[in-house]
Swiss-Prot record:
Belongs to the NusB family. The keyword Transcription applies. This is Transcription antitermination protein NusB. GO terms for molecular function: RNA binding. GO terms for biological process: DNA-templated transcription termination; transcription antitermination. It comes from the Bacteria. Signal peptide: none annotated. The gene is nusB. HAMAP family: NusB (MF_00073). GO terms for cellular component: cytosol.
Length: 155
């Protein structure tokens, strides 16, 4: 990957991975099925609990990165939750589902994708929260990740 991957392609991959992770959390559907829906150009519609509108049709999307994020988060969600838990002031089951998806995605990148600077991970999570989560969720996500970063990112 390295320098040849454009930031916009990674940003799109994160956005679609977040939506796919959220879909998985809601439906508990097989990750391969969710991935296939996104690769076929579908996006999860929360209101209808079904896939809707084009997803990976964005002109620049790092599909390999999307797959890594989605599969990695789903397969390691229990471990990721244990890394998030110490930095959250309320029970994990009380977290908004989108906030949980954001934190899992960012924690996966912080712990498994050392090629991505932790400040980039935090900034991208904040930007995704501003678009997809509740009004002040970006502040919560920023606080949790800021506290966690020095403890979970290997130097």
């Amino acid at each position: 990957m390295g320098a040849s991957v454009k930031p916009a392609a990674r940003r799109n991959a994160r956005q679609f991975a977040l939506q796919a992770i959220y879909s998985w959390q809601i439906t508990k559907e097989n990750v391969a099925t969710i991935e296939a829906q996104f690769l076929a150009g579908e996006k999860y519609d929360e209101e209808e609990h079904r896939a809707a509108e084009p997803a990976l049709a964005a002109p620049e999307t790092d599909v390999a990165y999307f797959r890594d994020l989605l599969t990695g988060v789903v397969l390691s969600h229990t471990e990721l939750d244990s890394k998030i838990r110490p930095y959250v002031s309320r029970p994990m089951q009380d977290l908004d589902m989108m906030e949980l998806a954001l934190l899992r995605l960012a924690m996966y990148e912080m712990t498994r994708r050392e090629d991505v600077p932790y400040k980039v991970v935090i900034n991208e999570a904040i930007e995704l929260a501003k678009v997809f989560a509740a009004e002040d969720s970006h502040k919560f996500v920023n606080g949790v990740l800021d506290k966690a970063a020095p403890h979970v990112r290997k130097k």
